[in-house]
From Swiss-Prot:
It comes from Burkholderia ambifaria (strain MC40-6). Belongs to the universal ribosomal protein uL5 family. This is Large ribosomal subunit protein uL5. One of its GO terms (cellular component) is ribonucleoprotein complex. It holds the Pfam family Ribosomal_L5. One of its GO terms (biological process) is translation.
Length: 179
């Protein structure tokens, strides 16, 4: 069992039951999945960009991402339907908890001028989104072997009904909120 998974069962669940007064442990919000998405608009010019991004995401997530394709043609962006325009990976279970552990304890402190993550990036239904500007904050990425700095979006999906419950859940995982 992953370290954060044990931490969730032993510390987070009792803390949230006490804070919100849940009657059952099944009511306690939990993280269901973490989705990493890398949009690569510049990939229309060079196909090697997709391969490098897939390699980076594979190292970061620990599993192979799926290449996302354009749903419809947009002439203004010079893309046709079916063009590869990004890469995405969904983490669940053990891999999800291990990624969250690495992200909170190792990657976030490596962000330049880091003062904490925004407490307002919730979607109203208890899910949290965070954008990372550089993939080099992850220790798995070798700085000398990257071809370009790429950002990625990290979506944390929870079973929380409100943003307050989700924020309490993530805060109990030692998420460094600034406000």
């Amino acid at each position: 069992m992953a370290r954060f998974q044990e931490f969730y069962k032993e510390k987070v669940v009792p803390g949230l039951i006490e804070k919100f007064g849940y009657k059952s442990v099944m009511e306690v919000p939990r993280i269901t999945k973490i989705t990493l998405n890398m949009g690569l608009g510049e990939a229309i010019a060079d196909k090697k960009i997709i391969e490098n991004a897939v390699g980076d995401l594979t190292k970061i997530a620990g599993q192979k991402p799926v290449v996302t394709k354009a749903r419809k043609a947009i002439a203004g962006f010079k893309i046709r339907q079916g063009y590869p325009i990004g890469a995405m990976v969904t983490l669940r279970g053990r891999a999800m908890y291990e990624f969250l552990d690495r992200f909170v304890t190792v990657a976030l402190p490596r962000v330049r001028d880091f003062r904490g993550v925004s407490g307002r990036a919730f979607d109203g239904r208890g899910n949290y989104n965070i954008g990372v500007k550089e993939q080099i904050i992850f220790p798995e990425i070798d700085y000398d072997k990257i071809d370009a700095l790429r950002g990625l979006n990290i979506s944390i999906t929870t079973t929380a009904k409100t943003d307050d419950e989700a924020k309490a859940l993530l805060a109990s995982f030692k998420f460094p909120f600034r406000n």
